[in-house]
C-alpha cells in the first residue's frame, strides 16, 4: 500500500480528484494518510476531514526561515511514514532541505505544457491568463517530479488541449 501525503493551499479540487480516484479503484493500492495545508482556511482541509483523512496546518509564518518551514513539513511527513508526496494546489516553493528525504518522491501538476509558462511566477490563473494573452492555440497540463528548481523536475506526463476561442 502506497502511503500518500498531500500538500494543499486552497479549495482542494485536485485533492478531491485524488480521493475519488482512490475510492473508485482507479488509483490502486494507495491511501492518503495525511493532508497538510499552509493556509488555515483552505477548503481542502474540509474535503480531507469529510473523507476521514488526517489533516494538519503548517504555516510558513510559524517559522523564522523558509528552511525551518521545509524541515517541519518533511519531519511531519516522515513521522506519518509517507512514501509519496503530491502537491495539489500547494502555493509555496519547497527548498532544497525538504528534498533530503523526499528526492524523487514529490509530484506536482502544472497547468501548462512545461517548459512553456512555467517557473517562478507562473501558477494558477496567471498561467491561463498568460496562455490567452500569448494567443496560444494549444495548452495543457504537465505532471512532473518536484525539485528545488521551480517546474524544472523530470516530466512524468503531459496532456495537450486546444484553446477554444471566446
Residue spans for each PLM region:
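Amphipathic, non-transmembrane alpha-helical secondary structure
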Residues: 16-20, 46, 71-78
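A general structural signal for well-ordered alpha-helical segments in protein cores
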Residues: 15, 44-45, 70, 124, ...
Amino acid at each position: 500500500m502506497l502511503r500518500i501525503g498531500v500538500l494543499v493551499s486552497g479549495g482542494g479540487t485536485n485533492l478531491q480528484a485524488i480521493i475519488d480516484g482512490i475510492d473508485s479503484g482507479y488509483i490502486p493500492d494507495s491511501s492518503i494518510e495525511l493532508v497538510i495545508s499552509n493556509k488555515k482556511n483552505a477548503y481542502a482541509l474540509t474535503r480531507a476531514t469529510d473523507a476521514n483523512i488526517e489533516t494538519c496546518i503548517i504555516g510558513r509564518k510559524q517559522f523564522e526561515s523558509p528552511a525551518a518551514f521545509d524541515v517541519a513539513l518533511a519531519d511531519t511527513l516522515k513521522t506519518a511514514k509517507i512514501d509519496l508526496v503530491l502537491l495539489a494546489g500547494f502555493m509555496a516553493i519547497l527548498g532544497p532541505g525538504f528534498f533530503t528525504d523526499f528526492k524523487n518522491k514529490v509530484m506536482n501538476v502544472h497547468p501548462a505544457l512545461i517548459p512553456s509558462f512555467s517557473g517562478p511566477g507562473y501558477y494558477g490563473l496567471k498561467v491561463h491568463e498568460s496562455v490567452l494573452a500569448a494567443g496560444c492555440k494549444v495548452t495543457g497540463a504537465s505532471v512532473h517530479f518536484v525539485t528545488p528548481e521551480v517546474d524544472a523536475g523530470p516530466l512524468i506526463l503531459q496532456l495537450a488541449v486546444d484553446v477554444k476561442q471566446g
